[in-house]
Amino acid sequence: MHAPHSVALAAGEALTDDERLHRARVFADELTRRRTVRDFADTPVPHAIIEHCLRAAGTAPSGANQQPWRFVAISDRAVKRRIREAAEAEEREFYSHRATDEWLRALQALGTDAEKPFLEIAPWLIAVFYERYGLDSAGNKHKRYYPHESVGIATGLLIASLHRAGLATLTHTPSPMGFLNDILEQPRNQMPYLLLVVGHPAPGCRVPDISRLPLEDYARFV
């Protein structure tokens, strides 16, 4: 097997196990305060904050290091309005015709409907795409390996980074989402993965009274 070109691993901080435990606990405790928000303020968020959070997302591992994620950060009011109008059209179809009764019952606890004002009110939308295949300069297609998994990891890092920066998020997945390619002029080899709504919670914001699974219900040690 051909030996890849390699470089020395950058030295990390020298930590004791107690220090590692403290960091792990603090990080987990901070993420337990993360909540999905649907009621946003229109308070501006500086471009640089979004940029650095996207930098963090871009550090995610990926299949064959192909890094198939593509992000479009949107603050333009007219573009956000177009996205809202297209998303609400799909959502009306979903709630009226596409969703099963079981699915609608599952959504009742969250209080969702076809109206999505947050798509205009929040200062930022981040459209997340994954590359189905790569294209070289000659237009030849190249397979992407594990694009869904890779982009899912990158999106998780993005959400965690935004939370760490003191911002609220909402993962929005209207189906289908092909309108994002049209509005944002993304090439057809890039498929919409989700739409992330980013900003500050509105004053008096309330969230559903739900709970998370305890650790023992979703993890075990062997």
Feature annotation, model-predicted:
Residues 58-65:
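Glycine-rich phosphate/pyrophosphate-binding beta-alpha loops
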Residues 180-193:
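Short, electropositive alpha-helical surface patch
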Residues 1-37, 41-52, 97:
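N-terminal accessory segments that position/regulate proteins before the catalytic core
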Residues 56-58, 109-114, 180-182, 205:
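Glycine-rich, charged/polar anion/phosphate-binding loops
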Residues 34, 55-57, 126, 132-183:
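Small-aliphatic-rich amphipathic alpha-helix that forms the alpha element of a beta-alpha
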Residues 3, 67, 73-151:
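Glycine/small-residue-rich phosphate/adenosyl-binding loop
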Residues 31, 53-57, 196:
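Short alpha-helical scaffolding segments that buttress acidic/His motifs in well-ordered protein cores
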Residues 1-23, 113, 191-222:
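C-terminal helix-cap and adjacent tail motif
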